Amino acid sequence: MTELNYISTLVIYYMKGRDYLIKEVIVVEGRDDITAVKRAVDAEIIATSGFGINAKTIERIKEAQKRKGVIILTDPDFAGEKIRSIISKRVKGVKHAYISQEDGLRAKDGNIGVENAKPEVILKALENAKITLEEKQEFFNMTDMYYFKLTGSSDSKARRQLLGKILGIGYGNANQMVSRLNNYGITKEEFIDAIEKIKKQLGE
């Protein structure tokens, strides 16, 4: 897999478009932040749901850090810094990306957050965190989801829940699961091993 370091990230990103994605998993606070980040870059993203961050989310962030590395991009306010501190204490070695309050300000109501930042602001913040770009890999697709009953079956949701728990990548719909399997670097061997464990748990 080809990787490109942060030094020329902006240039390469605009040259290559979405043939590359950010290697690290980005941690934000909420769904609106996810939308804003996805306007700027292609990456896996975890939302903490604000102060609602729980043990499951921490474990998922730990797994992401182990597999791909993590970049924290929380709001430039007290709550954002508190969440950043909580994660940093529990997950060692994470990278940090910051936007200024000015860049995160929504003028009409004074709201401050990542959700209000322009794509170029977010991309620059991530570049400053020394991101790595890697070529997209598609080892898994929707055919796998159907074949292994992760979609299209009456118990597909339960199977995806178990798969996410076993692999440490969290629950998602079929499309989200395909994305995570590819972007987290899950191997075919890990996947098949997880499928076998699911079958045993379901008594098959």
Residues of each region from the PLM?
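Short active-site oxyanion
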Residues: 21-25, 68-71
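N-terminal amphipathic/basic-hydrophobic helices that include classical n-h-c signal peptides
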Residues: 1-19
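TOPRIM fold recognition
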Residues: 39, 43, 51, 56-204
